[in-house]
């Protein structure tokens, strides 16, 4: 009897979860072309007609918050759609609609014998909104694809509702900044005094950030408390770093070659380059026991050692996770170093956060990404020994800025307090209690938590509207390095012209001209204020 009851319960649960599909079996052209988001079917039809008509400017209105920022803005021009594609779409047969737990739905359309479109929709703000398209191989496979992903889609949807909700009352935030905010340099130096390791989560090629770090470097308190600085450059180049800092004459070519070895096209962060030179200059004025040790932590392919396509494939397949390599190098260095002073790790904020969302852009193809270096180091060294700082940045992805953190709430607070540089603890603050949304994609993962789950401190340096353009190290592009990039492209089957949007022969002059023209007279985040 108990077994029978269990079977009945399981069957009931499965039936409740897997709602019976609603059969449609009509071609798209059988339905009117209207903008209607009232039901999953109508919303799916609306999305299909947006594709047929190339209406790029309407996708944001038809899509949910969790993908909206990726989509063209309202002034986007129509896309030209060829007649073959239009006919194919219009003749597609809408097979069925499935609703999952009243919040997730899909419309399955047979485009041709081999391609089934699965339009995914969520119920948000009283409307059924698009969150993307999946593909199936036949009707049954399309159902399986939808049901397999539906539970996670539902979790992301619930999280997106939380992330989307933002307070319009700034009083508590403004009061906290006024009561507890301190000067950023004092804040960072205090953290470096009280913690064996401070992780500074930065945004690359940001002059204001490197100027701040350089100012902190030259403060006498820094060399009293800090002996090691870890940087996000290739760890296999440590011997070259040691050679650079051991030299009695400033040899910038050593440093430039290190920068050229980071990624296939080099690393053109001028602020980091100048900071590393300033460490060399400072060390010349210090006794040996007070000098700063630079340790590189990133895992990158040793391109100069790779001579063939097969070398590249083997090296890439065996590449350790970047975050794990960073954590390994830091942990090992802290264990063996004789210098009792504390340490600073300067790394992109995407490698710094503490929550247990796996890191991005870190694992070799086919491998599961590990936790970030920040999360791993907290696990290994304890939360008390690691202090993680985030600087104020736009909301975005690894590909660029998309909007504002908490939809501009933090920016509004800093404006109300005079846009003066300030830093504060996130724990116990209204800022720390806000859902973490710095990384747009990651923010919809329920494991992301809030700001205090990811960082301990927050630093505001300047308003985003005043941000200088990317601080570019033009010096890395020499004629020999252009030849080396071409060689790297050949063994990796890549296209350098595509990377830099260059027609014809790739030259250093063309690369430099493209960057200078792109940034001339512009602020870095100008598109956010249009």
What are these regions (language model features)?
Residues 46-71:
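Short, well-ordered alpha-helical segments enriched in acidic and aromatic residues
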Residues 27-55:
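Short, aromatic-enriched amphipathic alpha-helices that serve as compact interaction elements
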Residues 22-38, 66-122, 133-136:
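Surface-exposed, charged secondary-structure patches
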Residues 147-530:
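Compositional signal for N-terminal targeting/processing segments
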Residues 63-66, 101-103, 110-113, 122-125, ...:
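A mature extracytoplasmic/lumenal domain signature
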Residues 129-149:
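A short, surface-exposed interaction/processing loop segment used at functional sites
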């Amino acid at each position: 009897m108990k077994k029978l009851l269990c079977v009945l319960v399981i069957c009931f649960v499965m039936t409740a979860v897997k709602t019976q599909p609603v059969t449609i079996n009509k071609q798209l052209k059988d339905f009117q072309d209207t903008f209607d988001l009232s039901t999953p079917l109508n919303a799916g039809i609306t999305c299909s007609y947006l594709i047929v008509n190339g209406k790029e400017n309407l996708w944001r209105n038809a899509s949910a918050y969790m993908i909206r920022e990726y989509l063209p803005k309202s002034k986007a021009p129509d896309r030209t759609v060829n007649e073959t594609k239009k006919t194919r779409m219009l003749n597609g047969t809408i097979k069925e609609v499935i609703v999952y737990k009243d919040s997730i739905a899909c419309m399955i359309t047979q485009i041709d014998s081999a391609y089934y479109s699965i339009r995914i929709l969520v119920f948000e703000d009283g409307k059924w909104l698009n969150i993307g398209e999946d593909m199936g191989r036949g009707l049954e496979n399309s159902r399986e694809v939808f049901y397999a992903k539906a539970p996670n889609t539902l979790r992301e949807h619930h999280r997106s509702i939380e992330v989307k909700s933002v307070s319009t009352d700034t009083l508590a935030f403004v009061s906290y900044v006024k009561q507890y905010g301190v000067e950023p340099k004092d804040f960072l130096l205090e953290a470096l005094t009280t913690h064996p390791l401070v992780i500074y989560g930065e945004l690359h090629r940001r002059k204001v950030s490197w100027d701040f770090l350089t100012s902190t470097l030259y403060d006498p308190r820094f060399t009293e408390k800090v002996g090691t600085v870890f940087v996000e450059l290739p760890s296999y180049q440590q011997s070259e770093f040691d050679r650079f800092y051991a030299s009695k004459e400033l040899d910038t070519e050593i440093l430039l070659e290190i920068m050229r070895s980071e990624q296939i096209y080099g690393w053109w962060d001028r602020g980091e380059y100048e900071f590393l030179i300033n460490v060399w200059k400072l060390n010349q004025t210090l006794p040996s026991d007070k000098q700063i040790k630079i340790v590189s932590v990133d895992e990158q392919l040793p391109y100069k050692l790779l001579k063939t396509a097969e070398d590249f494939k083997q090296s890439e397949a065996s590449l350790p996770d970047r975050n794990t390599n960073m954590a390994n190098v830091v942990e090992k260095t802290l264990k063996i170093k004789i210098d009792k002073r504390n340490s600073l790790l300067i790394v992109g904020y995407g490698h710094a956060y503490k929550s247990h969302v796996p890191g991005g852009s870190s694992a070799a193809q086919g491998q599961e990404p590990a936790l970030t270096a920040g999360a791993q180091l907290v696990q290994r060294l304890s939360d008390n020994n690691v202090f993680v700082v985030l600087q104020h940045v736009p909301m975005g992805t690894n590909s660029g800025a998309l909007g504002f953190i908490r939809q501009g709430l933090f920016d509004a607070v800093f404006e109300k307090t005079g846009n003066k540089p300030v830093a504060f603890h996130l724990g116990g603050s209204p800022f720390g209690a806000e859902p973490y949304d710095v990384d747009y994609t990651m923010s919809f993962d329920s494991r992301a938590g809030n700001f205090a789950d990811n960082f301990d401190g927050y630093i505001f340096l300047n308003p985003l509207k005043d941000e200088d353009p990317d601080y570019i190290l033009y010096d890395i592009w020499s004629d020999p390095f252009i030849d080396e990039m071409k060689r790297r492209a050949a063994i990796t089957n890549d296209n350098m012209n595509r990377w830099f949007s260059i027609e014809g022969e790739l030259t250093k002059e063309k690369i430099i001209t493209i960057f200078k023209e792109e940034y001339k007279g512009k602020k870095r985040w100008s598109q956010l204020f249009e």
